[in-house]
């Protein structure tokens, strides 16, 4: 208050305020007088008044009211900007200065205190552990912290469950919850010292059936170790741990069902097994105790010396109960730290960097309570050690030994040192003395470590060289020869050299907590130049999609990192890039954390050498362990964009490379399973498309869709109306800068368009698809009934056929035939088989293997598929419950196999005709009826199988459209909520902008999907790609998409108008032949009246797609020469069907196409000269006609295979 005139402490009372008067630094002292005291009181009062004048006799003011500071004239009227110093103390937030005060605007995951001058992190609920302790690696339960669990009695208890769980933020950043449930402490009566050392030394903290098998405590007598697991190395070092291999106990499905002692007591034989070794303890007496202690002490990293704990403010501390440095090492290792320290044997410290205040070793002379060879600090100091990590691997491999030979290095340590110095990541020791350096794990499988001890074996033991990284690869019997993952488990790495990609060409993921690069495919390293062609176009980020904490999300299909500066700002703290392909084409040095998730990453040689992020940048909020296994988190919008791109690429029938790219995109999308419902819905659609592509690749089948020109004309018009409606409102929003009401009005209009137009359009698409589904379902149902009738009729004539067979002298031979025809060769009577001649038996066996089994399989699949599809239809028709696409995805895979069974039907029909054509068989009574019924069953079965395929395809299409509809409904709900918040002033304009942008993005994506469907139909109609102006524009705005729609609308009107010049004629002759004829082309019409049918194949050799129009069928005519009425009726019907499958090639590529079934009926009175001339009865079916009302692609194939039936 200006009262600085006294040398002695002196209390002055100014009104109701008391303060101490003392001398200010740099001022002289003189005795205190009442006058001085009075002046001091006056000056104190004036310093509390912002506008009080300063008298010349007044002592200078030294302080003002909080929030203000002195001007040069002595006034307290100048605002004090608290934010200029240490951000106002707003750690984890931004300081906002106001006149005379300030407040904190907190980052995501932090909430302001009641005074608004601090930001406190969102925390999870505290945890407890019965018979154990729970400690946080951050000293609190703030989000991102880990709860570390330990049991009190570590000598006789073990954790059953995770050793730690993580506190995770919710999507809004307002609450937090634990990633899992707490474990329990389970008692274990058996304990020995070897068990403890074994468990710690060989990463036994995770008892999950991989390193050690769950079900047996790590501190019990017998231990199990899979030979393909991390603990395999102990087999070569058993003596070091004073254990011996004793064989295998009873083993059942990965669970040890008996202890070693029980097996011995029961007299079980202990046999060798390739998958497991059992180790038991040996006597760890006092004589062996020193060896045990040496091993335990070796599990502590290098000592850095003694440091004061006062210089360790940034370190985390934990309670240490057992007084062992080994335990502290394990705590800090699990928490992800590089260094640990022990204070007075009871406190464990963990940190990322060494402390700064080092003292003499004499200040840390106290030894650990239970580890006498290790120093454990004092009351005010701590011994600091590097965290011990067993990075040596020590695994024995076959295969590549390395790219660099080091003759001078003979030992492991020498080899590792040399290889590290030369920049390699692995050191390989062969024959216990030859050193090789490399940057990847060997190409061969891992083998028994004892093989590496054999001179001349050619095997090598592999060690890691760089303590900052840990390499991992795909596990399995055959190790992937290339490294697939490299991660920094210390969290300290903030950059990398791109030379890493060159040395590790198979690298797919690099992970630290500030820099994450992920590629679903192997990273490519070459001079890319223009190797980033926009397969699907460029998808830019959604405008407004960034929050106030500085997180920025960018969406691209193809992105060059040299353009990163255009899309970021100084405000960014974390940048997330989601793309199909990322080109690293320049050095990158940024101050924000960077995460890239792409299907492919390409590094340009000679243009880029390093990627660095700021060491003080914010850590990326993610579970690093999950990233190591599954890659960075997904983004919903990128998943929807990726699916749309894959759909377009999958429809590139003339480009198999694009289809393979589509498959890779879908594979990356579908594995592993996404975390939330919306992402899983998109993932389900991707799974179905992936299965469809798998079927195409496996069976070389391309299903031709069914669309009409009228449908596309309507669809393009509707899409155009939607674009116009959205564009008008968006243009208005762009010019609104101040009026909140105007912004709200236009935003609400966009919401209404979304509800009335976009969602309505999505529902209409679904309804139209359901109409096609119902049409296919009706055909399927009729054919299914006909199939059941045909099967019943076939079984009805079997008794007559049986009696004729049994009446023959050689009845055993015919009994074998009968059992084969009924059930296949597996059911043939053994006695009958024995009496059959070898030649006949061989014929029957061959037919059974290729045909009868196939028919059984077809019938089985049809029966099961009917139930599945019926249930799916019922769910899809629900207007309330969203359709769960996971229920049909697996069945789509079956559809791919159904194409094969169409051919099985045909083969079966031919082979059965061969059997029935045997003179002896055809002479039997009832053989003709049996043959005719069997042939009809095969014809209907073929048509039924095709109908099932068609219906399944319609199911997939309907399910996709239903899922899209559901997603739009959900998006509309979120949009409504955001607008409500904006209306109530609970949310900012940026949030409304973001959700509107997302809405526009989805609509544009759907319209692009319509364009992709149009281009697919165009290809099958014109046999050439659709015009570029009609192709989807994935990176375009609404207006650019509008241009494509307009052109597609014009092109759609011209589709389906060209007729075909090709006609087919099928003639039935020789109508005077016997009624019991076998050759289907030699039978009279009266035979066909008894449900006889036959197949007709259009002869096509080396069909080329360029000859499409030569084989596209305009009409097919069936003639029955000399047809006459029978005794009962004169009506005659001709049924003509085709499977719609054909093969062809284009540019050397072979295609198999499948369209919808063609079916027509021609009916007339055989006595009428108008309907049928006397010399023949004929029916003519129009297959492909001129006119836009016909389905443009329904009859686009030549229909090479026909089934004709006369009734």
UniProtKB/Swiss-Prot annotation:
Stored Pfam families: EGF_CA, WSC
Q: Where in the cell is it found?
A: Secreted
> Where does the UniProt entry place glycosylation sites?
745
* Residue ranges constituting the WSC domain according to the UniProt record: 300-391, 392-476
Offer an example of a GO molecular function term for this protein: calcium channel regulator activity
InterPro entries hit by this protein: EGF-like_Ca-bd_dom (IPR001881), EGF-like_dom (IPR000742), EGF-type_Asp/Asn_hydroxyl_site (IPR000152), EGF_Ca-bd_CS (IPR018097), NOTCH1_EGF-like (IPR049883), Sushi/SCR/CCP_sf (IPR035976), Sushi_SCR_CCP_dom (IPR000436), WSC_carb-bd (IPR002889)
Taken from the UniProt record, the cysteine pairs bridged by disulfide bonds within this chain are: 83-95, 90-104, 106-119, 124-167, 151-185
User: Looking at the UniProt record for this protein, which Gene Ontology cellular component terms does it annotate, in alphabetical order?
Assistant: extracellular region; host cell presynaptic membrane
Q: Where does the protein principally reside?
A: secreted
Q: Which UniProt keywords apply?
A: Calcium, Calcium channel impairing toxin, Disulfide bond, EGF-like domain, Glycoprotein, Ion channel impairing toxin, Neurotoxin, Presynaptic neurotoxin, Repeat, Secreted, Sushi, Toxin, Voltage-gated calcium channel impairing toxin
Q: Which residues form the Sushi domain?
A: 122-187
EGF-like domain ranges (all copies): 79-120
Q: In which tissues is it expressed?
A: Expressed exclusively in the four pharyngeal lobes and in tissue located at the base of the teeth. No distinct expression is visible in the putative venom glands or elsewhere in the pharynx.
Subunit note: Dimer; probably disulfide-linked. Interacts with Cav2.2/CACNA1B calcium channel.
The free-text function statement in the UniProt record for this protein reads: Potent venom presynaptic neurotoxin that promotes a long-lasting increase in spontaneous neurotransmitter release at the peripheral and central synapses by selective activation of Cav2.2/CACNA1B (N-type) channels. In addition, it drastically enhances synaptic-vesicle recycling, an effect that is prevented by the Cav2.2-specific inhibitor conotoxin-MVIIA. It activates Cav2.2/CACNA1B by shifting the current-voltage relationship of channels towards more hyperpolarized potentiels in a reversible manner.
Other remarks in the entry: Does not show activity on Cav1 and Cav2.1/CACNA1A calcium channels. Has at least 2 paralogs (GLTx paralog 2 and GLTx paralog 3). Paralog 1 is the most highly expressed paralog.
Name recorded for this polypeptide: Glycerotoxin paralog 1
Organism whose genome encodes this protein: Glycera tridactyla
């Amino acid at each position: 208050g200006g009262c600085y005139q006294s040398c002695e402490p002196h209390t002055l009372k100014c009104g109701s305020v008391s303060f101490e008067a003392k001398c200010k630094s740099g001022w002289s002292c003189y005795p205190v007088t009442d006058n001085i005291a009075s002046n001091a009181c006056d000056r104190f009062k004036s310093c509390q008044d912002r506008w009080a004048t300063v008298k010349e006799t007044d002592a200078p003011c030294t302080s003002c009211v909080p929030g203000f500071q002195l001007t040069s004239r002595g006034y307290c009227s100048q605002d004090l900007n608290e934010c200029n110093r240490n951000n106002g103390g707003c750690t984890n937030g931004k300081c906002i200065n106001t006149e005379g005060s300030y407040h904190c605007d907190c980052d995501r995951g932090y909430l302001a205190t009641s005074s608004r001058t601090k930001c406190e992190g969102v925390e999870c609920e505290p945890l407890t552990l019965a018979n154990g302790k729970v400690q946080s690696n951050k000293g609190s339960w703030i989000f991102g912290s880990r709860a570390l669990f330990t049991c009190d009695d570590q000598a006789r208890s073990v954790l059953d469950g995770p050793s730690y769980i993580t506190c995770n933020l919710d999507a809004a950043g307002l609450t937090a919850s634990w990633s899992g449930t707490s474990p329990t402490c389970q008692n274990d009566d058996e304990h020995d010292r070897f068990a403890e050392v074994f468990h710690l030394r060989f990463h036994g903290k995770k008892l999950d059936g991989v390193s050690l098998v769950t079900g047996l405590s790590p501190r019990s007598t017998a231990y199990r170790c899979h030979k393909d697991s991390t603990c395999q190395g102990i087999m070569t070092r058993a003596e070091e741990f004073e254990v011996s291999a004793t064989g295998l106990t009873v083993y059942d499905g990965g669970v040890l069902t008996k202890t070693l002692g029980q097996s011995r007591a029961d007299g079980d034989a202990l046999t060798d097994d390739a998958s497991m070794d059992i180790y038991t303890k040996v006597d760890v007496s006092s004589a062996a105790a020193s060896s045990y202690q040496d091993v335990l002490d070796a599990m502590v990293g290098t000592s850095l010396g003694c440091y004061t704990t006062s210089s360790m403010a940034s370190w985390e501390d934990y309670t240490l109960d057992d007084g062992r440095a080994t335990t502290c090492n394990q705590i800090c290792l699990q928490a992800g730290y590089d260094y640990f320290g022990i204070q007075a044997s009871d406190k464990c410290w963990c940190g990322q960097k060494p402390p700064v205040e080092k003292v003499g070793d004499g200040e840390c002379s106290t030894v650990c309570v239970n580890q006498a060879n290790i120093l454990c600090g004092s009351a005010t100091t701590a011994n600091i050690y590097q965290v011990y990590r067993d990075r040596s691997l020590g695994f024995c491999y076959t295969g590549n030994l390395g790219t660099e030979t080091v003759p001078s290095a003979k030992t492991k340590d020498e080899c590792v040192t040399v290889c590290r110095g030369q920049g390699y990541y692995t050191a390989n020791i062969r024959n216990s003395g030859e050193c090789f350096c490399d940057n990847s794990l060997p190409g061969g499988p891992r083998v028994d470590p004892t093989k590496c001890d054999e001179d001349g074996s050619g095997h090598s033991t592999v060690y890691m060289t760089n303590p900052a990284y840990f390499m991992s690869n795909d596990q399995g019997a055959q190790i992937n020869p290339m490294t697939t993952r490299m991660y920094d488990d210390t969290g300290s790495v903030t950059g990398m050299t791109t030379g890493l990609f060159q040395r590790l060409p198979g690298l797919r993921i690099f992970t630290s907590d500030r820099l994450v690069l992920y590629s679903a495919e192997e990273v490519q390293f070459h001079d890319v130049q223009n190797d980033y062609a926009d397969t699907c176009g460029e998808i830019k980020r959604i405008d407004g999609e960034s929050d106030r904490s500085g997180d920025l999300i960018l969406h691209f299909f193809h992105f060059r990192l040299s353009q990163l500066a255009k899309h970021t700002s100084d405000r960014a703290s974390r940048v997330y890039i989601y793309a199909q392909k990322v080109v690293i084409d320049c050095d990158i040095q940024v101050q924000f954390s960077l995460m890239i998730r792409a299907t492919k990453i390409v590094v340009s040689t000679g243009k880029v050498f390093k990627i660095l992020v700021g060491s003080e940048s914010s850590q990326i909020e993610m579970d690093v362990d999950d990233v190591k296994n599954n890659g960075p988190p997904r983004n919903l919008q990128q998943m929807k964009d990726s699916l749309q791109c894959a759909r377009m690429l999958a429809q590139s029938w003339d480009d198999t490379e694009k289809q393979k790219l589509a498959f890779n995109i879908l594979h990356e999308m579908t594995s592993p399973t996404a975390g939330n419902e919306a992402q899983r819905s998109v993932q389900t659609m991707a799974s179905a498309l992936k299965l469809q592509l798998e079927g195409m690749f496996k069976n070389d089948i391309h299903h031709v869709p069914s669309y009409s020109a009228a449908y596309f004309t309507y669809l393009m018009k509707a899409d155009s109306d939607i674009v116009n409606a959205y564009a008008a409102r968006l243009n208005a929003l762009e010019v609104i800068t101040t009026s909140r009401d105007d912004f709200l009005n236009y935003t609400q209009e966009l919401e209404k368009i979304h509800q009335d137009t976009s969602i309505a359009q999505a529902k209409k698409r679904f309804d139209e698809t359901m109409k096609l589904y119902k049409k296919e379902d009706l055909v399927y149902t009729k054919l299914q009934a006909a199939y059941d009738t045909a099967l019943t009729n076939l079984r009805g004539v079997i008794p007559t056929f049986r009696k004729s067979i049994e009446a023959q002298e050689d009845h055993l031979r015919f009994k074998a035939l009968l059992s084969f025809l009924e059930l296949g060769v597996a059911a043939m009577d053994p006695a009958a088989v024995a009496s059959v001649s070898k030649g006949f038996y061989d014929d029957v066996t061959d037919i059974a293997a290729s045909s009868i089994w196939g028919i059984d399989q077809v019938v089985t699949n049809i029966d099961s598929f009917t139930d599945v599809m019926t249930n799916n239809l019922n769910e899809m028709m629900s207007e309330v419950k969203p359709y769960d696409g996971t229920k049909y995805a697996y069945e789509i895979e079956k559809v791919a196999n159904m194409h094969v069974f169409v051919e099985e039907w045909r083969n079966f029909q031919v082979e059965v005709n061969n059997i029935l054509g045997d003179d002896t068989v055809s002479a039997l009574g009832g053989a003709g009826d049996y043959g005719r019924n069997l042939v009809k069953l095969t014809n209907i079965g073929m048509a039924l199988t095709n109908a099932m395929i068609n219906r399944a395809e319609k199911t997939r299409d309907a399910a996709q459209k239903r899922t899209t509809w559901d997603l739009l409904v959900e998006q509309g709900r979120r949009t409504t909520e955001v607008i409500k918040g904006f209306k109530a002033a609970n949310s900012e304009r940026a949030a409304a902008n973001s959700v509107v942008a997302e809405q526009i993005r989805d609509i544009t994506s759907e319209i692009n999907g319509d364009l992709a469907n149009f281009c697919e139909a165009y290809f099958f109609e014109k046999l050439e790609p659709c015009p570029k102006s009609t192709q989807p524009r994935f990176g375009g705005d609404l207006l650019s998409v509008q241009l494509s729609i307009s052109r597609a609308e014009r092109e759609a009107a011209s589709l389906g108008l060209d007729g075909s010049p090709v006609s087919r004629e099928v003639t039935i002759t020789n109508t005077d032949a016997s009624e019991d004829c076998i050759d289907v082309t030699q039978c009279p019409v009266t035979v066909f009246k008894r449900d006889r049918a036959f197949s007709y194949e259009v002869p096509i050799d080396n069909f080329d797609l360029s000859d499409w129009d030569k084989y596209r069928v305009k009409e097919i005519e069936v003639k029955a020469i000399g047809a006459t009425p029978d005794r009962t009726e004169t009506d005659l019907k001709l049924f003509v069907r085709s499977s719609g499958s054909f093969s062809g090639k284009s540019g050397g590529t072979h295609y198999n196409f499948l369209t919808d079934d063609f079916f027509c009926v021609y009916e007339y009175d055989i006595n009428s000269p108008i309907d049928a001339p006397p010399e023949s009865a004929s029916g003519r079916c129009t297959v492909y006609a001129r006119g836009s009302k016909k389905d443009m692609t329904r009859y686009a194939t030549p229909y090479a295979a026909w089934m004709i039936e006369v009734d």
